[in-house]
Amino acid sequence: MAKKITGFIKLQIPAGGANPAPPVGPALGQKGVNIMEFCKQFNAKTQSEAGMIIPVVITVYSDKSFTFVTKTPPAAVLLLKEAKLQKGSGEPNRNKVGTVTMDQVRKIAELKRPDLNSIDLEGATQMVIGTARSMGIVVEG
């Protein structure tokens, strides 16, 4: 018989940087998950992507065991990395803080495609362009 699912936990954690401190510890502790076990598994799986923020969906079962699925980094984080910026604009319609090329946007769209609800690459590209626009990043080309 399959294990009964008791809940899902969605977090965004720096790759290779999961530790029992907030926000990871309290979120997992509420569901009774072994925090250190999750941290070890997550850090081992995401070690190669150090420095990126990785969204993770943790499925908690009735016997307090868990499984987790990592997603691709948020488009905003990837855009900031490509534009070599620390953060986006506070007033994106007035202050432009950086630029990215269309090739960089396509590269991000290809990377994000599995997690986006778009039919084709063009739709995914348009979503990434919209994210860039809302962050005050100009897309050239």
Curated annotation (Swiss-Prot):
The keyword Ligase does not apply. GO terms for molecular function: large ribosomal subunit rRNA binding; structural constituent of ribosome. SUPFAM superfamilies: Ribosomal L11/L12e N-terminal domain, Ribosomal protein L11, C-terminal domain. One or more lysine residues are methylated. One of its GO terms (cellular component) is cytosolic large ribosomal subunit. The keyword Ribonucleoprotein applies. GO terms for biological process: translation. It comes from the Bacteria. Belongs to the universal ribosomal protein uL11 family. Forms part of the ribosomal stalk which helps the ribosome interact with GTP-bound translation factors. Part of the ribosomal stalk of the 50S ribosomal subunit. Interacts with L10 and the large rRNA to form the base of the stalk. L10 forms an elongated spine to which L12 dimers bind in a sequential fashion forming a multimeric L10(L12)X complex. This is Large ribosomal subunit protein uL11. It comes from Chlorobaculum tepidum (strain ATCC 49652 / DSM 12025 / NBRC 103806 / TLS) (Chlorobium tepidum).
